[in-house]
Regions:
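Charge-dense, helix-prone N-terminal extensions
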Residues: 2-123
């Protein structure tokens, strides 16, 4: 970050790091239920995030509806998810104004959104 100024931040998130972070969470599995292009991450069978292999600069994540709107207003890299219910799903572009810390927190939030709706026996 040398020479970038005081307000600069380094963004390094990519599809591999996103995958590794998702899989680091407890009881997360991955599969490709739609086709060989879309990798989804699940907690007890429930999807909380996904990435498309042919668009590796973008991830889709579950989100609380109110928070989803706030994030879209605050960050140009966060939009309602294409082909998903935009009320509950955001898509986040890597290497724009959402830094790695924010993206990891959004993965955690997506995971928590699924976790809180699991039956007690699965928690």
């Amino acid at each position: 970050m040398q020479g970038l100024g005081n307000n600069a931040f380094c963004i390094i998130m990519n599809i591999e790091e996103f995958r590794e972070y998702c899989l680091s969470l407890p009881k997360v599995t991955e599969d490709m239920p739609f086709d060989e292009n879309v990798l989804v991450f699940r907690l007890h069978g429930k999807i909380f995030a996904c990435v498309a292999m042919d668009n590796p600069d973008l991830a889709t994540m579950k989100c609380d509806p109110e928070k989803a709107i706030e994030l879209r207003e605050q960050y140009s890299s966060i939009e309602g998810a294409f082909h998903w219910n935009k009320k509950f799903w955001n898509q986040v572009w890597f290497n724009q104004d959402a830094d790695d810390k924010l993206i990891r927190s959004l993965v955690d939030h997506a995971y928590d959104e699924v976790y809180k709706k699991l039956p007690k026996r699965l928690k």
